[in-house]
Amino acid sequence: MVLATNSRCLAYHGPLLYEAKILMSYDPSKRGSKAKVEDGLPPTVEIGNVVNTHKRKRGPRASLPAAGATPDGDDSNDKNRHFSPKEGKPDVPADLADENEDKICYYVHYKGWKNTWDEWVGEERVLALNEDNIKLQKELKAAALAAAKKGKDFDALAPPEALSETASPAPTTKRKSMASKDSPAEGPRPVKRRGGLAALEDLEKEDDYLKRKEIALVVPDKLKAQLVDDWEFVTKDHQLVGLPRKVTVVDILKEFKKEAEAKYRPGSADADILNEVVSGIKLYFDRSLGSILLYRFEREQYLQITQSPDHSNKTMSEVYGAEHLLRLFVSLPGLIAMTNMDAQSVAVLKEHLEDFVRFLSTHQKTYFLKEAYTNASPAYEALSKGL
């Protein structure tokens, strides 16, 4: 029996089961994708949790809800998911693996995960959401915990939003698998999967994490409008930010630090905290760029950059600029929620982060330039679609 589109289910990801939502289903006997997604729905900004529910207007700027807002309380992209066929196979989804074309499959969104983890899975990986299967889900988690306590290698993939280190999802194309050499073009950065006690800690903290509240960063309206423009340039106009940027993330952080440290006595505790915050922003940017800061259309460019000998010794903060750095501040509240910082430390960090956001706003005309975006070539567009 084919499960209904938009219904809830349990789906295997690694050896564990996670609650998921079925966004589309594929039945080879009917040679079609049962996508209950209507065209013409407002576009959804794919970065973090900021959602743009307005179509582009060349008059007044479209507005964004406050950072942290999510559509219908979920981070699924069903409002922005449209059926795209494979070349020469009009009834087969473009991103469905060849080996799955002859079996029932579901395009699922894992509850609480970023939509970059949405994927087609075979029906053998999907279970109905009922009491028996929920019991199985709990038993699998308990078995994983027991294995971790005994020091056995545990290869479970806990939800990516719950881990401080994560493994990347299985690539669906050859080009995506090439990206696994460095940070992937889709999904979190590739690091060694955690086993033993580390995996145990991940699982035990998973429930606690989901209960945490994100901090609310104040983002000026003109930077929210900047995010809307950025999203439209890339996803609607198929433009790319020229790389490497003349003024990089590293350059911007240096300018901010130079301006901010004038308020503090050299060597003071406040000056030390400022240094840590600046270093932390750079670290977060370098580690999260390939996983959560790119639109799909930009991933081929990222792949080319990471494989270029000219940039082999550079971090991403030495290549990318303000456009991608601003996207980080949409996701930072959720990333900070994954840490174990106490309330006082979070309050201090929040103050410095908002100082930096105001700095970006003050220097918007310097760092955010429309001419930084250029039209992608037809060859690039073909590569980005995996043709």
Swiss-Prot record:
Gene Ontology, cellular component aspect: NuA4 histone acetyltransferase complex; Rpd3S complex
Q: Which PROSITE patterns match?
A: MRG
- The residue ranges flagged as biased composition, category Basic and acidic residues, are 76-92
Keyword Transcription regulation found: yes
TM stretches of this protein: none
Keywords, alphabetical? Chromatin regulator, DNA damage, DNA repair, Nucleus, Transcription, Transcription regulation
Superkingdom of source? Eukaryota
Tell me the InterPro entries matching this sequence: Chromo-like_dom_sf, Chromo/chromo_shadow_dom, MRG, MRG_C_sf, MRG_dom, MSL3_chromo-like
Query: What are the subcellular locations of this protein?
Result: Nucleus
GO BP term, pick one: chromatin remodeling
Q: What are the residue boundaries of the Tudor-knot domain, all occurrences included?
A: 100-126
Q: Which Pfam families match?
A: MRG, MSL3_chromo-like
| Location of the MRG domain | 211-385
Region: Disordered; residue ranges are 52-96, 159-197
Describe the subunit structure. Component of the NuA4 histone acetyltransferase complex.
* Purpose: Involved in deacetylation of histones, chromatin assembly and chromosome segregation. May act as a transcriptional oscillator, directing histone deacetylases to specific chromosomal domains. Component of the NuA4 histone acetyltransferase complex which is involved in transcriptional activation of selected genes principally by acetylation of nucleosomal histone H4 and H2A. The NuA4 complex is also involved in DNA repair.
Q: Which family does it belong to?
A: Belongs to the MRG family.
Name of the protein this chain belongs to? Chromatin modification-related protein EAF3
